[in-house]
Amino acid sequence: VGTTVHYPRNTCAPMECGVVIAEHLPGDEGYDVLSNFMGPFSLHAVMAMALKVAGNKLRHRVPRDSGGSFGVKQAVFPYVVMMCLASRKAGAPVKWVEDRLEHLSAATSATARLTHIEAAVTPEGRILALRYDQADEVGAYLRAPEPATFYRMHGALTGPYAIDNLSVRNRVVVTNKTPTGLVRGFGGPQVYYALERLMDRVAVALAIDPVELRLRNFVPSDAFPYTAAAGAVLDSGDYTRLAMMAIAEADVHQLRERQAAARAAGKLYGIGVAAIVEPSVS
């Protein structure tokens, strides 16, 4: 059973746009920067190399509070480098404040992905293998830390399911759009949108309830710690019990009644289910 899905670009609009204040320190041949860049340590080495200085020659400070980010402000780092160079040229501190139009026009967006995904399935609904063919549209060029959208989730491509066999093909496509980057759990939505759509397709093909299909494929509670096919270590859990708690809390019977009434009135009313596992660290 297979399906092809397209996950579109999407982004966030934090209340506070990007801000950088940079000062060249001529005696030190270093730089002092204050910005609302999200996670300055993560790309500190990249910025230092771009400026052709040792890491200890670039001091990068961030305020304790920032008006939102959701990953988008990771893309402030190119402007940090540019403002450092502008400060060196001007011989004075330089401040850059991104306005809303700039942000909406050119800020980072989540990576668009085209995925073809297939499952080898027994007649009883046990999934034996998965095959992913993923193509990420990353804009005009790869900008650090891309293609991390692929690899943050790579170890967990089988989700919460006990699937022993996995084949993966990843490709990057460049276009004439702005570069992509980190947005809200980057890599996770792209993977699970495809995987959970496939689970629903399998359920339809075998005439099995979507919840029951997932229950048949969850990693058993006595199998933890469980090493997934692509390497993720799932340390603990009871996915079946958790799913049953969610079903009970959702009152599916009442949802079905609402669905029937809505459809009788000519309205669309869907009931969705998804099971995901997110890495605890990036």
Predicted regions and their residues:
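Structural alpha/beta core scaffold segments of enzyme domains
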Residues: V1-S282
